[in-house]
Amino acid sequence: MWTIAQLAVFAILALADFAVAGEIEQLKEVLGKFNKDYKQGNMTRLASDFRSALKEYGDGQQGESTVVQEFLKKTEDNGEQRAMEKLETEWKDYVTALGKHYDQKENNFRMAIFESNELMTERINKKYEQGLVSYTTALNDLADLTDEEFMVRNGLRLPNQTDLRGKRQTSEFYRYDKSERLPDQVDWRTKGAVTPVRNQGECGSCYAFATAAALEAYHKQMTGRLLDLSPQNIVDCTRNLGNNGCSGGYMPTAFQYASRYGIAMESRYPYVGTEQRCRWQQSIAVVTDNGFNEIQPGDELALKHAVAKRGPVVVGISGSKRSFRFYKDGVYSEGNCGRPDHAVLAVGYGTHPSYGDYWIVKNSWGTDWGKDGYVYMARNRGNMCHIASAASFPI
């Protein structure tokens, strides 16, 4: 596809050619349509109409070698134009399906981000077909966000004193028998201990959703009742303990809050996706804990033991890679992860016949993300994406 700059240059050159031929009025009409399409941001129509108009003029030049004929010759292969038409159709379908609305300038900006992400997902999926990676990707409702906008959702904020090598101990590290034989696979969803996947939206409240989900499973094991607990309660009411509302927080801090005050049900303290004044009352608190245990940072065997014997465990992972943002299926494995920045819930583990060991991880980006809201992350791959570096569970 010719760029705006290239088309403009051809227009200027063609102007001289038209002027010599005494066809200045015809060129004005061509450039008028060019201007209109440019202002509307319709690149496909711009290129197509501009070329068609020049072709109409060029056909009457009796085979003369002109700038117009040169332009027409260079643009005979319209494969890139077809690709642009395909992109614009996909983009229109995308924004329509999600009910997104942008003015023309913003629309072009967002479509460029969408295109970049589409190309990235296509590259990964090609590698999957070639057997080079163990997961697939697909565009989702995050496909038109800048990296900065997306990172707002990654709300795990580790305390400054946290040492991912295990030198810090805010609670007692989980103790377990390393020689104990554990089940080959565990999935707490099949035991009725996991509530449906929810969507945190644009608030950096992943820590609140992960903590609430862990407390739901804990309460189910203690009482036999599975309740939907309130992440909003945690977002609003743990700031005095050091969390930062929609700007992020830390799961153990939320567990400490639950042990002191209790957590309300979602129906009594519904999620709104923004920070509000704490509206906690003793009368609506339904679930408490007795503190929490942490996994020795980096110890995946300890994490496996805790998931098998104690229940779902909140984990901090590196979720900033675009490959993770658009994960769809398979066993996610990434060799170049950053520090933990996103809180999720490990609800089980297993082994894929082709791709090896994995963790079953519940996310809070809605069911359209990943495999119905879940990601299967590589296990026993050197603590991949720090999955065992900031893990804890209620007791």
UniProtKB/Swiss-Prot annotation:
Gene3D superfamilies reported for this sequence: Cysteine proteinases (3.90.70.10)
Keyword tags: Disulfide bond, Hydrolase, Protease, Signal, Thiol protease, Zymogen
Catalytic activity as recorded in UniProt: Specificity close to that of papain. As compared to cathepsin B, cathepsin L exhibits higher activity toward protein substrates, but has little activity on Z-Arg-Arg-NHMec, and no peptidyl-dipeptidase activity
Broad EC category: hydrolase
Family matches, as InterPro entries: Papain-like_cys_pep_sf, Pept_asp_AS, Pept_cys_AS, Peptidase_C1A, Peptidase_C1A_C, Peptidase_C1A_papain-like, Prot_inhib_I29
Any one GO MF annotation of this record: cysteine-type endopeptidase activity
Name the record gives this protein: Cathepsin L-like
GO terms under biological process: proteolysis
Lineage: Eukaryota, Metazoa, Ecdysozoa, Nematoda, Chromadorea
Active-site residues, record numbering mapped to chain: C206, H342, N363
Disulfide bonds: C203-C246, C237-C278, C337-C385
Species for this entry: Brugia pahangi (Filarial nematode worm)
Signal sequence coordinates: 1-16
PANTHER family in the record: CYSTEINE PROTEASE FAMILY C1-RELATED
Cleaved propeptide residues: 17-181
Family affiliation: Belongs to the peptidase C1 family.
SUPFAM superfamilies reported in the protein's UniProt record: Cysteine proteinases
Enzyme Commission no: 3.4.22.15
